């Protein structure tokens, strides 16, 4: 454990309840906090107004640093201005890379979502896929919109399907109806592991011949890539996002260091397919991939 004085860092995400992705982020953050002698205050709310309130609470608690996801940057800018006015250093992670610097963060940890989407689109184009359905589980989330835009840039026949990610039964029925109506859909893409695992059911129920591809990872999804039910996934390595964000704030307090040199620190995209999924599964079983 670092010999530096105890410090308090708030990590404030837009995580919905039950999404395993955020467990991995939190694991990374907690590991960095333990090493850096940091008291970690982890909170999250998928509703933008409530996430802004959590930021204001952290400012009132006089934390030493704030790590924040920027899925809805406009809704958070006033709260983050209060943090910068109070002299609290900020890093962003996971979502909102484009807005990060103007909202006062000194760096951003995450994957460039447009590039990640293009990586998926290129891989699908190589495989001969022409009619992907890209499923967005949270309308207006800048990162998810960028992923599908990236896919569409490489495969112009891509269609967007909006679903309510907070209700998996509704995700399954909406995707099933879409696949039944769109006989030419040849691949359906989930933008998160729990969504993709649900889309596998939709493909079966719809009697569709569409293949399934994904973004993000958990151990169930890694297993589906190993056994060939899912073509591949693109991992943004969320453990690194949580770890990097907390550690960067500690480094800033320790020596005024600003990791990233004013640029983002990229944690992805990392493609996981049958060639490397078994290796990744080992780490997914530990909850770090």
Predicted regions, residues:
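Immediate post-signal peptide segment of exported/extracytoplasmic ligand-binding proteins
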Residues: 1-9, 34, 125-128
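Short, low-complexity disordered leader/linker segments with a strong preference
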Residues: 1-8, 81-88, 289
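Extracytoplasmic "Venus flytrap"
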Residues: 7-32, 36, 41-53, 57, ...
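Short, solvent-exposed amphipathic alpha-helices that sit
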Residues: 20-36, 116-120, 142-158, 174, ...
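Hydrophobic alpha-helical segments within soluble ligand-binding/sensing domains
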Residues: 51, 107-132, 170-172, 218-221, ...
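Hydrophobic alpha-helical
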Residues: 52, 68-84, 151, 165-223
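Flexible loop/hinge segments that line or gate small-molecule binding clefts
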Residues: 74-115, 218-231, 281
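Hinge/cleft segment of the Venus flytrap/periplasmic-binding protein
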Residues: 154-155, 240-289
């Amino acid at each position: 454990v670092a010999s530096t004085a105890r410090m308090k860092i708030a990590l404030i995400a837009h995580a919905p309840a039950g999404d395993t992705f955020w467990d991995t982020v939190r694991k990374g953050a907690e590991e960095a906090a333990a090493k850096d002698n940091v008291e970690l205050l982890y909170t999250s709310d998928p509703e933008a107004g409530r996430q802004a309130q959590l930021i204001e609470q952290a400012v009132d608690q006089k934390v030493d640093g704030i790590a924040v996801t920027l899925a809805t940057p406009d809704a958070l800018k006033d709260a983050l201005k209060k943090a910068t006015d109070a002299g609290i250093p900020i890093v962003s992670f996971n979502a909102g890379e484009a807005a990060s610097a103007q909202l006062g963060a000194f760096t951003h940890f995450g994957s460039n979502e447009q590039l990640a989407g293009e990586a998926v689109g290129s891989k699908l184009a190589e495989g001969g896929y022409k009619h992907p359905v890209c499923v967005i589980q949270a309308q207006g989330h800048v990162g998810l919109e960028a992923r599908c835009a990236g896919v569409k840039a490489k495969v112009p026949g891509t269609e967007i399907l909006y679903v309510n990610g907070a209700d998996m039964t509704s995700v399954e029925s909406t995707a099933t109806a879409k696949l039944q109506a769109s006989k030419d859909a040849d691949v359906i893409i989930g933008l998160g592991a729990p969504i993709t695992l649900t889309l596998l059911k939709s493909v079966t129920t719809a009697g569709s011949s569409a293949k399934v591809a994904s973004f993000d990872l958990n151990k169930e999804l890694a297993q589906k890539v190993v056994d060939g039910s899912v073509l591949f996934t693109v991992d943004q390595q969320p453990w690194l996002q949580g770890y990097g964000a907390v550690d960067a704030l500690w480094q800033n307090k320790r020596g005024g260091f600003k990791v990233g040199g004013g640029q983002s620190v990229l944690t992805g995209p990392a493609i996981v397919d049958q060639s490397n999924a078994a290796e990744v599964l080992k780490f997914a079983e530990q909850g770090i991939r």
